[in-house]
Amino acid sequence: MPHKVFLTRLKLSDFRNYATLALDLDQRHVVLTGENGAGKTNLMEGVSFLSPGRGLRRAAYADVARVGAPDGFSVFAAVDGMEGSVEIGTGTQGTEEGQSRRLRINGTAARTVDELTDHLRVLWLTPAMDGLFTGPSADRRRFLDRLVLSLDPEHGRRASEFDRAMRSRNRLLSEFRPDPAWLSAIEREMAGLGISMALARQEMLGLLSALVERSRSDGTFPSASLSLAGFLDDCAGIPAFELEERYLAMLAEGRARDAAAGRTLDGPHRSDLLIRHREKDIEAERCSTGEQKALLVGLVLAHARLVGDMTGHAPVLLLDEIAAHLDQGRRAALFDLVDGLGGQSFMTGTDRAMFDALGERAQYLAVANGRVSG
């Protein structure tokens, strides 16, 4: 069983509809119940800021700060983490657009938000993800990259640097006579970063697919088969340096085409995550809405188990409205699976009765108008 990582204290200041919030938590799961709009998801969004990135809503920081707040927002948590007890504080100063958030760990300023992954991994599933299988490929790439990031914290940096280099290449190609030496240098950088991204994604799919295959006998949720398409689909077994040279040649040969298009048409930013229902052997987008939800739940739980297996530390799970469309039997099975992961989870719902099967395994909190009571 992986080591249990859990929050013991959570404080929010000027965060969404919370002027101030202070919660003492124990090791159990946390169930948040209340009417829609009460602030349940806002609270979970606060927890999601204990991971790199912009949280489970991917919102601009200026939008996260409470309306009318004189300054930015802050999130504080005391965590029994991967390296022992730790105090984490993060937030922004001011309400202007384009600002970055600050991070302090045990009172010391962190060099980068990636340091959060030294202490805990936070994963989530929200209703906004329900359209993952039928939505644009960019959503599936983002989903996959978050899966990768949970095991490879450097993946986010590589993706950001690739995007920056690609924008530089696009600007150069828009010029009348771009400097060929500068263009070649940028393409060399893109090749190294792009292939690293592609291989990290392939490795994640291999690990996750193997775990899904081993867990198929559970049967509570359907299992998914996963593959990538759209960029170097036939790269299995080919050395990284050879793939880099291949991508470098693609970029050089595509300069005129990309200049005319105004964008780069080859690269990991064009990949798509393909998902199939294993038992029915059909594409996920052709499944019913209920089947798609069940597939997604199964995939997120499998990934959470993989993170626990690979790191030795169970992730913190944020499951928004997770029980809303499940019957009583499947809800009970879901709670057993979540509990079996060995970590702390936060779950939301409008009706506490939906969580009866959790019993004493959870701490129950009622949320109303930005206030939380036990």
From Swiss-Prot:
NCBIfam families given in the database record: recf
GO biological process, one term: double-strand break repair
GO cellular component term of the entry, any: cytoplasm
Cellular compartment(s): Cytoplasm
Sequence similarity: Belongs to the RecF family.
InterPro entries with a match to the protein in the record: AAA+_ATPase, DNA-binding_RecF, DNA-binding_RecF_CS, P-loop_NTPase, RecF/RecN/SMC_N, RecF_2
Keywords tagged on the record: ATP-binding, Cytoplasm, DNA damage, DNA repair, DNA replication, DNA-binding, Nucleotide-binding, SOS response
Name listed for the protein in its UniProt record: DNA replication and repair protein RecF
Pfam family, one: SMC_N
DNA repair listed as a keyword: yes
Annotated residues for binding of ATP: G34, E35, N36, G37, A38, G39, K40, T41
Entry annotated with the keyword DNA damage: yes
PANTHER family: DNA REPLICATION AND REPAIR PROTEIN RECF (PTHR32182:SF0)
Gene Ontology MF annotations: ATP binding; ATP hydrolysis activity; single-stranded DNA binding
Biological role: The RecF protein is involved in DNA metabolism; it is required for DNA replication and normal SOS inducibility. RecF binds preferentially to single-stranded, linear DNA. It also seems to bind ATP.
